[in-house]
Design a protein with these regions (language model features):
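N-proximal helix/coil linker or "cap" segments that precede and/or mark the start of modular domains
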Residues: 15-37, 167
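Hydrophobic beta-strand anchors of alpha/beta hydrolase catalytic cores
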Residues: 56-57, 87, 130
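Bacterial Sec-dependent N-terminal signal peptides
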Residues: 1-22
């Protein structure tokens, strides 16, 4: 009987340790696929020149705590990768609502999309949701920027830029 118990425990242990932790996107995966056409209804900052740049697009809202928590990281990425990367925050809220938010301060490009065109194509079901698009228009990273174990970090961005930057 003891042998059967040990055998069962061993099989259970192997099964549990073999399980892979998966990243839940809360959206349709576009990894390594063409990104949907870029669309906003109104820029709240000047419109960036996107040609030849990587785009980090953050779908967010002022009422979303995790969205606001990610803003300082996105500010950091915008400064750190200024030569290669454009960070854009897109909210579906009213212009006045977004402009009224003072803390944390957004130090990257900002726009609203009241039509939610890109959100619908990406089938986003949870925010914040970030996509990182290479200069050829392919999604190279997608997800929640602070998701434990799958965080979007400077190292991740650097690796993607080095791999997909046009020479």
């Amino acid at each position: 009987m003891y042998k059967y118990f040990l055998f069962g425990l061993m099989v259970f242990s192997i099964t549990v340790s073999a399980q892979v932790v998966e990243k839940n996107l809360y959206a349709k995966s576009f990894i390594d696929q063409k990104a949907p056409d870029f669309h906003v209804t109104k820029w709240l900052t000047n419109e960036p020149k996107r040609e030849g740049k990587f785009l980090l697009i953050d779908f967010w809202a002022t009422w979303c705590g995790p969205c606001r928590k990610a803003i300082p990281e996105l500010n950091k990425f915008s400064k750190e990768f200024n030569d290669d990367l454009i960070v854009i925050g897109i909210s579906n809220e009213k212009e006045e609502t977004v402009k009224r938010m003072q803390v944390p301060k957004i130090e990257y490009y900002s726009a609203i999309d009241s039509t939610e065109k890109m959100e619908k194509i990406l089938e986003i079901k949870g925010i914040p949701h970030v996509i990182l698009i290479d200069p050829d228009g392919y999604v190279r990273w997608q997800g929640f920027p602070l998701y434990p174990g799958f965080e979007l970090t400077s190292d991740v961005i650097k690796e993607i830029i080095e791999k997909y930057k046009k020479k």
